[in-house]
């Protein structure tokens, strides 16, 4: 799987309450819920993001409350993947479980800027910054985790591999 898009850059400790504020968690429709993605840190995020765009952040992305809604709204907003120096463990697991591609790569996270166009190859872990002509290498996920992401999440992966 390869993702290509423009970067939205965030710093350290972007918590789940910033990704999707708790005041909206009563909204059951994920597309509608996604219209509030990142609004407390960038109130124009949802109007700027295009299908395929990529979030790049530094340390501890997705910290805070255990909230499956956080990776769901990122995915539903059109973001194709998230790259960070590190992820909070529960966000990491929730992202895989719902099929949101993520990669940890400190060098990429520290050197990619807002608006850069990047290409991410999840099978190899190669992250290419097309804008700057740079390349970074993340550790790709094992095949079984890549299959979960390709099947759009854990439940779909289990259904697809029954048999």
Curated annotation (Swiss-Prot):
Which pathway or pathways does this protein act in? Amino-acid biosynthesis; L-leucine biosynthesis; L-leucine from 3-methyl-2-oxobutanoate: step 2/4
At the top level, the lineage of the source is Bacteria
For biological process, the GO terms are: L-leucine biosynthetic process
- Point out the coiled-coil segments of this chain: none
EC number in record: 4.2.1.33
Gene Ontology MF terms in the entry: 3-isopropylmalate dehydratase activity
Q: Which InterPro entries match?
A: Aconitase/3IPM_dehydase_swvl (IPR015928), AconitaseA/IPMdHydase_ssu_swvl (IPR000573), IPMI_Swivel (IPR033940), LeuD (IPR050075), LeuD/DmdB_bac (IPR011824), LeuD_type2/HacB/DmdB (IPR011827)
- Catalysed reaction, written as an equation: (2R,3S)-3-isopropylmalate = (2S)-2-isopropylmalate
Q: Which UniProt keywords apply?
A: Amino-acid biosynthesis, Branched-chain amino acid biosynthesis, Leucine biosynthesis, Lyase
- Asked whether the UniProt record includes Amino-acid biosynthesis among its keywords, one would answer yes
Q: What class of enzyme is it?
A: lyase
Which Pfam family, any one of them, does this sequence belong to? Aconitase_C
Subunit note? Heterodimer of LeuC and LeuD.
Which NCBIfam families does its entry note?
Answer: leud (TIGR02084), LEUD_arch (TIGR02087)
Q: What biological function has been recorded for the protein in this entry? A: Catalyzes the isomerization between 2-isopropylmalate and 3-isopropylmalate, via the formation of 2-isopropylmaleate.
Its family remark reads:
Belongs to the LeuD family. LeuD type 2 subfamily.
Q: By what name is this protein known?
A: 3-isopropylmalate dehydratase small subunit
Q: Which organism is it from?
A: Clostridioides difficile (strain 630) (Peptoclostridium difficile)
